[in-house]
Amino acid sequence: MNPLTLIIIMFTLFMGTMITVFSSHWLTMWIGLEMNMLAIIPILINKATPRSTEAATKYFLTQATASMILMMAITLNILDSGQWTLINPQNQLTPVLITLALIIKLGMAPFHFWVPEVTQGVPLKSGLILLTWQKLAPLSILYQISPSINPTMMMSVAILSIMVGGWGGLNQTQLRKILAYSSIAHMGWMAAIITFNPNTMVLNLIIYILMTIPMFMMFMQHSSTTTLSLSQMWNKNPLMVSTILITLMSLGGLPPLTGFIPKWIIIQELTKNGNIILPTAMAMLALLNLYFYMRLIYSSSLTMFPTTNNLKMKWQFESTKRMPLITPLIILSTMLLPLTPALSVLN
């Protein structure tokens, strides 16, 4: 892609998200979402292969459907209230439709089917943008309308997303699909807390992004996309593989790593609100995610795949890519737990 074209597309993507995040008007919010959707399509098909084209088409059709539902909900809100601002909707159907549209855009269960397929079909850089930056705009709208969201609907979506995120990743050998199912599970945790404490949802989102970015950066550093390539990397760069495995444990929410913070705070917040069974079920289902991360760790480090002479010589072809931000991001993604007492301001 032409560098100037790429700059324009990335600027449009950035502006679309910022317009949505900082807007309190439904029309500008919708325009920002559409700018965001149209700008990401060329990024997804940056390498024009049949697979990336198919992934971009799936993404476009899904997002267009969600945008149509959202526009219908906005129209109903205008007919009922006569205003374009984000106020408590008078019609009970309006917040349900808005929530439904945003759930589709975020790829939460039961509308999650496009997330693993699209993530698998695009390059690692595009997958990183898809699973991190593209979550900001829809979640900002959910944050603003959180007082009018149906808690029962969101808790059902949350439990289902955590379950799907755990079960879906069990049989996967593709690293991008594993991270896609991890994203679905993390979206479930955010959905569970948004009606009770939206600020905790923001904290969860920040920590999720801090953990996902270094994972993708480490995969990009060595062009690893499968568990086989990850295990073969052990011969070439054992320190990097060890870091990847620790970050995977953090993504799974294993204490005392960073990923344990949001789960701990969310379970505490739900318990304070009188929910005992739901956080218990969420914690049990989260073990599925931790299980397939631990299995990936076992297959990558404790068992060694057969190595050939060509593989042993890979040290001569070290990657020349340099990512200076990767070290502080790795530290943040694994060692943030000592800062947790300072997060008591959220309570």
Swiss-Prot record:
Belongs to the complex I subunit 2 family. The keyword Cytoplasm does not apply. It comes from the Eukaryota. This is NADH-ubiquinone oxidoreductase chain 2. It catalyses: a ubiquinone + NADH + 5 H(+)(in) = a ubiquinol + NAD(+) + 4 H(+)(out). Core subunit of the mitochondrial membrane respiratory chain NADH dehydrogenase (Complex I) which catalyzes electron transfer from NADH through the respiratory chain, using ubiquinone as an electron acceptor. Essential for the catalytic activity and assembly of complex I. Pfam families: NADH_dehy_S2_C (PF06444), Proton_antipo_M (PF00361). The lineage of its organism: Eukaryota, Metazoa, Chordata, Craniata, Vertebrata. It comes from Oryctolagus cuniculus. Its main location: mitochondrion. GO terms for molecular function: NADH dehydrogenase (ubiquinone) activity.
